[in-house]
């Protein structure tokens, strides 16, 4: 093997990109995280990633409380956005602004971006207004979400 090719192969194998076990989150979820941090600055966005039956991946059963209902509505909102041609909510980026806890979806977003931005904006506002119950974090989904 050519020494130059060997050097390139070694560089790729030990690079941060090749060695990372953490996959980057889809860009839209990064924006949603930032929206949550805008409206609920005193709580980590991770607190919402595994809450109740609907906050996080998937969702089933009856929401356990108002905060979980916010996530159910958000899931349904993404479902509606997916009906727009070539709209993939988890990957669609959009333009928005956060100013002193107020979120605004900016003009210039296409139909998909506008819909996804509004889904995320409304969910982040809902999170800010719903009580957080530590007992509903990381619950047994099989037992409580049927």
From Swiss-Prot:
PLA2 catalyzes the calcium-dependent hydrolysis of the 2-acyl groups in 3-sn-phosphoglycerides. The keyword Endoplasmic reticulum does not apply. SUPFAM superfamilies: Phospholipase A2, PLA2 (SSF48619). Binds 1 Ca(2+) ion. Disulfide bonds join 38-98, 53-145, 55-71, 70-126, 77-119, 87-112, 105-117. One of its GO terms (biological process) is arachidonate secretion. InterPro entries: PLipase_A2 (IPR001211), PLipase_A2_Asp_AS (IPR033112), PLipase_A2_dom (IPR016090), PLipase_A2_dom_sf (IPR036444), PLipase_A2_His_AS (IPR033113). It comes from Naja sputatrix (Malayan spitting cobra). PROSITE patterns: PA2_ASP (PS00119), PA2_HIS (PS00118). SMART domains: PA2c (SM00085). It holds the Pfam family Phospholip_A2_1. Keywords: Calcium, Disulfide bond, Hydrolase, Lipid degradation, Lipid metabolism, Metal-binding, Secreted, Signal, Toxin. Ca(2+) binds at residues 54, 56, 58, 75. Its main location: secreted. Expressed by the venom gland. This is Acidic phospholipase A2 D. The lineage of its organism: Eukaryota, Metazoa, Chordata, Craniata, Vertebrata. One of its GO terms (cellular component) is extracellular region.
């Amino acid at each position: 093997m050519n020494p130059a090719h060997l050097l390139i192969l070694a560089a790729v194998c030990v690079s941060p990109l090749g060695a990372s076990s953490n996959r980057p989150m889809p860009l839209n979820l990064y924006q949603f995280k930032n929206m949550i941090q805008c409206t609920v600055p005193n709580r980590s966005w991770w607190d919402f990633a595994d809450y109740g039956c609907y906050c996080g991946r998937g969702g089933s059963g009856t929401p356990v409380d108002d905060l979980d209902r916010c996530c159910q509505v958000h899931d349904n909102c993404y479902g509606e956005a997916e009906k727009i041609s070539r709209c993939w909510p988890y990957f669609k980026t959009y333009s928005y602004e956060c100013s002193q806890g107020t979120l605004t979806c900016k003009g210039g977003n296409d139909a998909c971006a506008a819909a996804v931005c509004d889904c995320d904006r409304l969910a982040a506002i809902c999170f800010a207004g719903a009580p957080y119950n530590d007992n509903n974090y990381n619950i047994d989904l099989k037992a409580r979400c049927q």
